[in-house]
Curated annotation (Swiss-Prot):
Its EC number is 1.1.1.25. GO terms for cellular component: cytosol. This is Shikimate dehydrogenase (NADP(+)). Signal peptide: none annotated. SUPFAM superfamilies: Aminoacid dehydrogenase-like, N-terminal domain, NAD(P)-binding Rossmann-fold domains. Homodimer. The active site is at K68 (proton acceptor). PANTHER family: BIFUNCTIONAL 3-DEHYDROQUINATE DEHYDRATASE_SHIKIMATE DEHYDROGENASE, CHLOROPLASTIC (PTHR21089:SF1), SHIKIMATE DEHYDROGENASE (PTHR21089). HAMAP family: Shikimate_DH_AroE (MF_00222). InterPro entries: Aminoacid_DH-like_N_sf, NAD(P)-bd_dom_sf, SDH_C, Shikimate_DH, Shikimate_DH-bd_N, Shikimate_DH_fam, Shikm_DH/Glu-tRNA_Rdtase.
Length: 269
């Protein structure tokens, strides 16, 4: 019988996921051996795939696109963060056999901005571009930092307005945005196809930090546009990725990994 603790990330597609490399680095820090695999679940077959994984000895799992809402529905109980987001990216198998759902995306983002990058969130004006699951997942934790103002802008304004109403924040149409934002966070997936959010350069005039939730080359179109438009500092989402993974690892194993060396390691791959 295999006694090495097993973990996995579920998604579709999932072959590109860096989670196995990240969690192997965390295990090295803890001084333990773990198995961490990628599992591509079929659309409509997510619940069965998760149940089979846990039945076969799995201890915990990460969940990525497009299954975060399904993971929420699958969970027997939820953290407050997961309840607020309506989405789950971390599944924990409890001793009683039940599955607990959590969402560590918001921690990954806010820790990266406030701790690694040293940018204050409290009292600042924050613009979120996009109104999909990535943005929804981070708003509850972002609100805990008490920014002076959080605004959502999205290509489809009605979607942004609905999300803003749900969380008690603001929504402004993309073409009506003006400057005055301290922190601008791109939560759209446009960079993956080289597309930019349809915002005016003047939106970045007073921007302290422009941040893209995606990482590497996919983040560069937005970050380059932000720099050219006046943003003082830019960052991609690699630190968020490692940070949310570290929070998941801690939930599973009670060990808090050091994020910074793993961000540096992943950057050099």
């Amino acid at each position: 019988m295999n006694t090495v603790p097993r973990y996995a990330v579920f998604g579709n597609p999932v072959a590109h996921s860096k989670s196995p490399q990240i969690h192997r680095q965390f295990a090295l820090q803890e001084g333990v051996e773990i198995e961490y695999e990628r599992i591509c679940a079929d659309t409509g077959g997510f619940a069965q795939a998760v149940e089979a994984f846990f039945a076969d000895g799995g201890r915990g799992a990460n969940v990525t696109v497009p299954f975060k809402q399904e993971a929420f529905a699958l969970s027997d109980e939820h953290s407050e963060r997961a309840l607020a987001a309506g989405a789950v990216n971390t599944l924990i198998l409890l001793e009683n056999g039940k599955i607990r759902g959590d969402n560590t995306d918001g921690i990954g983002l806010t820790d990266d901005i406030s701790k690694r990058l040293g940018v204050e969130l409290s009292g600042k004006t924050v613009l979120l571009l996009g109104a999909g699951g990535a943005v929804r997942g981070v708003i509850p934790v972002l609100k805990e930092y008490r920014p002076a103002r959080i605004v959502i802008a999205n290509r489809t304004h009605t979607k942004a307005a609905e999300m803003a109403a749900h969380f008690g924040i603001e929504a402004i149409p993309l073409d009506e945005l003006e400057g005055g934002f301290d922190i601008i966070i791109n939560g759209t997936s446009g960079g993956l196809s080289g597309q930019l959010p349809a915002v005016s350069p003047k939106v970045f005039e007073h921007c302290t930090l422009a941040y893209d939730m995606v990482y590497g080359e996919a983040a560069e179109p937005f970050l380059a546009f932000a720099r050219q438009s006046g943003a003082k500092q830019t960052a991609d989402g690699l630190g968020m990725l490692v940070g949310q993974a570290a929070a998941s690892y801690r939930l599973w194993r009670g060990f808090a990994p050091d994020v910074l060396p793993v961000v540096q390691y992943m950057r050099e791959l």
